[in-house]
From Swiss-Prot:
Protein source organism: Mus musculus
Domain of life where this protein originates: Eukaryota
Keyword terms, alphabetized: Glycoprotein, Secreted, Signal
Similarity-based family: Belongs to the NXPE family.
Protein name: NXPE family member 4
GO cellular component: extracellular region
Keyword Secreted: yes
Record gene name: Nxpe4
Length: 543
């Protein structure tokens, strides 16, 4: 018994040592190289002091030409879906009250599995038919008593008419909703506004050097004649800037926080479109319920288990008894701890993926948090179960990070660099979520970041094709948020861009956008039912 106990202790010690080395390399390769007197190469954010428009290095690791062309291609696709619309007066914009929604081929009872189509005719506040499309609508069917819901597909014919299609997933009384989130004139104004500047958010950087603490202005773009610190990701040519404090080195940047700036690129008349009373207005009449029955007694065909690389249907699934049921595949019941056994899971992104970390820790009681000696809400998190060889880490993505709370930037870096440092193998799982913090900035910033992550994943899957990669799209958020900065329209365009960029990779996609629409959630941090459904799909992808 003593020999057995000794062996177990030895194996646990060996695992701790291996895990510590792996985690140190993952988190701070420079520290490890220094410890073992290896040559140091700063492969993360390079610090450069220079003028407000620093020269681009001549010898780039990768030519940016291909990236620029791809950014333009994705932008052009979005531009075609969001053409400029004239705005002269509120009366001539789309009115949910005056628009009509007509069920095509109505029946007393509809059948489970059928498609229900609704024709929407957009009209302005004077009752006139609209001659063009572009309205931002959100369609949903739901049965509160059954805790069931699903999104609807909206097809824009670009002539003022729309086809809203619902798949009738369940039987019972089903309510229908078609919300006019923003009229086409408002959508056009938001799209134009988003392209106009990086200054809607003010960043304040805190430099700590000895006993000295200095705050200066920071930004993704700084138009300043004073000396700047440039924090450059040299490989992907993404940079963040701060005004350099006198007699303080750029490397002393330690903390960051942000706040909204009182700036708008909308006219006073356009801003009236985004008053709360004009957002998410119902188009359907009050008598919007239909009856659905199970007309066919045949057994439903067995769907294959959800796996990586599957093309998602539209809608991607539905909610039933507060749990998610995918449309094109099936979810097997999986014991979480058994599935996580022996796996290294890296959660990278914003606080919506940090919710996963919190969920794992609350549901797997043998996970122990490791003190990484950081402070603040956005500190990196690590939880391990040494007996089961489980390691789960959450790490925030690189700039921009928006928040009034102070957060540390000592270890901040872009996700692409973390991926490049990851060896990968069949028990390594990477989960990425980007979106919410990019909404207030021109969308080319988000597209560039997504493309750089895509390239890093290509490199990872080339050297280690067994590595499991999962993307969680962003979700809907509060309707009363600052619309010009955080509207769900901005999130939806990013959602479309992300799906376009990653469609060629063999990765698992968790369609958090469609899920939160189906649940009827308007919260940047969805409740536990939604998080549980997301993680249930994730477990089916990896086990």
């Amino acid at each position: 018994m003593k020999t057995l106990a000794s062996r177990k202790s030895l194996w646990m010690l060996l695992f701790i040592v291996i895990f510590w080395v792996s985690f140190t390399v993952f988190r701070n390769p420079v520290k490890l190289r220094t410890m073992f007197k290896l040559p140091v190469s700063f492969n993360r954010w390079n610090l450069v002091m220079g003028p407000s428009c620093p020269a681009v290095p001549l010898n780039l690791p990768v030519s940016p030409k291909e990236t620029e062309l791809r950014i333009r291609e994705v932008l052009e696709k979005l531009d075609k879906q969001i053409p400029p619309r004239p705005f002269t007066h509120l009366n001539y914009t789309t009115s949910a009250t005056h628009s009509t929604a007509t069920i095509l081929n109505p029946r007393d009872t509809h059948c489970v599995g059928d498609q229900l189509d609704i024709l929407v005719e957009a009209r302005d506040h004077l009752g006139n038919r609209k001659g063009y499309g572009g309205d931002f609508m959100r369609a949903r069917m739901f049965s509160p008593a059954l805790k069931a819901g699903a999104s609807g597909k909206v097809t824009d014919f670009n002539n003022g008419t729309y086809l809203v299609s619902f798949t009738l997933f369940w039987e019972g009384t089903v309510s229908l909703s078609i919300l006019l989130m923003h009229p086409s004139e408002g959508v056009s104004a938001l799209w134009r506004s988003r392209k106009q500047g990086y200054d809607r958010i003010i960043f304040s950087g805190q430099f700590v050097s000895g006993a000295s603490q200095v705050h200066t202005e920071c930004a993704l773009v700084l138009n300043s004649s004073v000396e700047l610190c440039q924090y450059l990701d040299a490989q992907d040519q993404e940079a963040f800037y701060c005004v350099k404090p006198p007699n303080v080195p750029c490397a002393a940047l330690t903390y960051m926080q942000s706040k909204n700036k009182d700036v708008s690129y909308l006219s006073q008349q356009e801003r009236s479109l985004f008053e709360r009373s004009n957002i998410a207005v119902e188009i359907m009449e009050k008598s919007n319920a239909i009856s659905v029955s199970k007309c066919n007694t045949d057994t439903a065909p067995v769907k294959e288990k959800c796996k990586l690389g599957m093309v998602s249907a539209i809608p991607s699934g539905h909610v039933w008894k507060n749990a998610w049921t995918p449309a094109s595949c099936s979810l097997a019941p999986i014991k979480m701890k058994d599935c996580l056994r022996g796996k290294f899971i890296y959660l990278m992104g914003d606080s919506t993926i940090r919710q996963w970390m919190e969920y794992f820790k609350s549901k797997v009681n043998t996970l122990r948090s490791v003190d990484l000696h950081e402070s603040g809400k956005l500190q990196h998190q690590l939880a391990v179960d040494l007996d089961e060889k489980i390691s789960i880490q959450w790490q925030k993505h690189g700039y921009p990070l928006i928040g009034s709370l102070v957060y540390s930037v000592k270890e901040i870096e872009n996700i692409a660099r973390i991926i490049d440092r990851t060896g990968g193998e069949k028990n390594t799982v990477i989960v990425i979520s980007l979106g919410q913090h990019f909404r207030p900035f021109p969308i080319d910033l988000f597209i560039r970041r997504a493309l750089n992550v895509h390239k890093a994943l290509q490199r990872l899957l080339l050297r280690s094709p067994d590595t499991v990669v999962v993307l969680k799209t962003e979700n809907t958020r509060e309707l009363n948020s600052d619309v010009e900065r955080f509207s769900d329209f901005h999130g939806y365009t990013q959602y479309l861009a992300l799906k376009d960029i990653f469609q060629d990779l063999n990765v698992g996609v968790i369609d958090a956008w469609d899920m939160t629409v189906a649940y009827g959630i308007n919260n940047v941090h969805p409740p536990e039912d939604v998080v549980r459904s997301q993680i249930n799909i994730f477990l089916n992808y990896i086990c």
